[in-house]
């Protein structure tokens, strides 16, 4: 039994609050257990220099954690004068993942910036950020189409992410911080809506894991992702 009382295949309680921010084209506050992330999507009429004149858009992402989002206060990276390696890795992951589910040609010569700000961290911030960012992106595209800025919907697919790992010899879904910090294996899976993989980030923390164990984690992660896709659809259809 997990310390939280959850079953091995059980997600933490999840909520998706639409449009908590009034200025972004799309936004979402995602809560997965005690991990809370605000995700927003903002549209700009400029693109990176390497895309100018190509009639193609771009999606990029920025990620950050509030100083009090963890048990011990973390210093703002702006004060330190540079982003940490973890921050850069996560925001690149989010940007790559989002670009996989949008037709950049149909976006036209504009850029959508995804901002993910962690309010409270209890494991799985990057996976929560990706799942919430899809909602923000979807709402932004919906608004751009309503305003006739976009004529065709450039979204190709849903996207969601979830962690899976081996903790005390058991394959478990959606690791919280205590589980993540003591797991033998920790893998983040990013899925498209049809179940295809977009990205896999995995590490053996204590000893190597077998192909059989990996496939068991993949199978469990697919079940979790299916629940996330269902929840995304429910909140979007009701908005």
UniProtKB/Swiss-Prot annotation:
Reactions catalysed according to its record: tRNA(n+1) + phosphate = tRNA(n) + a ribonucleoside 5'-diphosphate
Origin superkingdom: Bacteria
Keyword Signal: no
Record keywords: Nucleotidyltransferase, RNA-binding, rRNA processing, Transferase, tRNA processing, tRNA-binding
GO biological process: rRNA catabolic process; rRNA processing; tRNA processing
EC number: 2.7.7.56
Molecular function terms, GO-annotated: 3'-5'-RNA exonuclease activity; tRNA binding; tRNA nucleotidyltransferase activity
Binding, phosphate: 86, 124-126
InterPro entries: ExoRNase_PH_dom1, ExoRNase_PH_dom2, ExoRNase_PH_dom2_sf, PNPase/RNase_PH_dom_sf, Ribosomal_Su5_D2-typ_SF, RNase_PH, RNase_PH_bac-type, RNase_PH_CS
Principal EC category: transferase
One Pfam family it belongs to: RNase_PH_C
Family as reported in the entry's similarity comment: Belongs to the RNase PH family.
Assembly and binders: Homohexameric ring arranged as a trimer of dimers.
Task of the protein: Phosphorolytic 3'-5' exoribonuclease that plays an important role in tRNA 3'-end maturation. Removes nucleotide residues following the 3'-CCA terminus of tRNAs; can also add nucleotides to the ends of RNA molecules by using nucleoside diphosphates as substrates, but this may not be physiologically important. Probably plays a role in initiation of 16S rRNA degradation (leading to ribosome degradation) during starvation.
NCBIfam families in UniProt: RNasePH
Stated name of the protein: Ribonuclease PH
Organism: Rickettsia canadensis (strain McKiel)
């Amino acid at each position: 039994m997990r310390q939280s009382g959850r079953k091995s295949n059980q997600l933490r309680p999840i909520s998706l609050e639409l449009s908590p921010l009034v200025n972004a084209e799309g936004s979402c506050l995602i809560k997965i257990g005690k991990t809370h992330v605000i995700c927003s999507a903002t549209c700009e009429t400029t693109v990176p220099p390497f895309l100018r004149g190509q009639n193609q858009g771009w999606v990029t992402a920025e990620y950050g954690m509030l100083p009090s989002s963890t048990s011990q206060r973390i210093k703002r990276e702006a004060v330190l004068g540079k982003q940490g390696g973890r921050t850069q890795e996560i925001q690149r992951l989010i940007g790559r993942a989002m670009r996989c589910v949008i037709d950049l040609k149909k976006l036209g010569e504009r850029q959508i910036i995804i901002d993910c700000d962690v309010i409270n961290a209890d494991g799985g911030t990057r996976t929560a950020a990706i799942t919430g960012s899809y909602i923000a992106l979807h709402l932004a595209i919906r608004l751009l189409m309503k305003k006739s800025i976009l004529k065709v919907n450039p979204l190709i697919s849903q996207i969601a992410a979830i962690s899976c790992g081996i903790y005390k010899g058991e394959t478990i879904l959606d690791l919280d911080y205590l589980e993540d910090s003591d797991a033998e294996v920790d893998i983040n899976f990013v899925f498209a809506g049809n179940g295809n993989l977009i990205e896999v980030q995995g590490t053996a923390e204590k000893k190597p894991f077998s192909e059989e164990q990996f496939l068991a984690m993949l199978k469990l992660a697919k079940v979790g992702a299916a629940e996330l896709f269902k929840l995304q659809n429910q909140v979007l259809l009701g908005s």
